[in-house]
């Protein structure tokens, strides 16, 4: 089974992926880590400031094929990041889709207005938790 976790910034994607990894014992792939590895290695023309749409166009083909490989090999995987396209299903045949679950984490406008300080205060919880 492959779980896809995506959503807006500070929505808790990395924390959810970490908790799923701990609960299930499955590996997880952080698209942010992949992005920064490619950028720092000089293997891609992008920068950390590259717009999300361009970043998605660059990273998604690689991640998509990693997902297919995991399904083909009967392996479990958690993929986490904001660079998953909304139309991701279009890239998979039905026999792959049967093994993929997706969850998008989003905040409503009301939630953001009422909890803005809380969101900022917990923005880096996973990084601090692992120190």
List where the protein language model places each region.
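Conserved nucleotide-binding/hydrolysis micro-motifs of P-loop NTPases
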Residues: 34-35, 84-85, 107-113
